[in-house]
């Protein structure tokens, strides 16, 4: 089995190292990760400059681009053989609910999924790398279980792991995405030169953390596994939009 591993925290991140170590023995690993932290990069690709690729001292391949760049370059320019699985993480912090739209960790996995490859994004629910070894142990078990399945189509899984000892994990739940309140306002400050600058504010608290959501599972101490899709079509509104757009359809 061939596994492509990436992340968004950068090629020196403890979460990436822990994940790679945990996956040893499962197959041939290729690690391609960003040169610097690209948290919040979402699915962006770098189109306005060329990308450089080098092998770092730790043996990982690093790219001066986004997480999506890393997976795209790996799949279309670096790997001679298509991988059987793309794995991203382990992220320093949760990627639940609305986070998935912004997450570079999820985006790296999604890039593989766009190429028709099963993919899994792993995140540690609290920042700071506490219990990262336990999270890596969970990640290995999820990967082992996923690759053992004979699924009709590739899956894209978003996995959030509580920051706690392995023995204290309260099981695993298959969940839907919850929802956050809007982010906090930007933080305005002034540079020593008198210029006004703005920092993006903290993420909002959970607005939908009902049973069955990723927020609820992690709050209960359980690992959350959410299958994702990339079709953003709101199918339930197609007929409604067709009705109000009908005059335009006839006149344009």
Swiss-Prot record:
Molecular functions per Gene Ontology: 3'-nucleotidase activity; 5'-nucleotidase activity; exopolyphosphatase activity; metal ion binding; nucleotide binding
Compartments (UniProt record): Cytoplasm
List of residues binding a divalent metal cation: 8-9, 39, 91
EC number(s) recorded for this UniProt protein: 3.1.3.5
UniProt main location, coarse: cytoplasm
Cofactor comment: Binds 1 divalent metal cation per subunit.
InterPro entries: SurE (IPR030048), SurE-like_Pase/nucleotidase (IPR002828), SurE-like_sf (IPR036523)
Pfam family, one: SurE
This protein's UniProt keywords: Cytoplasm, Hydrolase, Metal-binding, Nucleotide-binding
Keyword Magnesium annotated: no
Reactions mediated catalytically: a ribonucleoside 5'-phosphate + H2O = a ribonucleoside + phosphate
EC category name: hydrolase
Cofactor(s) the protein needs: a divalent metal cation
One GO cellular component term noted in the UniProt record for this chain: cytoplasm
Free-text function comment from the UniProt entry: Nucleotidase that shows phosphatase activity on nucleoside 5'-monophosphates.
Entry-linked PANTHER family: 5'-NUCLEOTIDASE SURE (PTHR30457), 5'_3'-NUCLEOTIDASE SURE (PTHR30457:SF12)
Family recorded in the similarity comment: Belongs to the SurE nucleotidase family.
Name of the molecule in the record: 5'-nucleotidase SurE
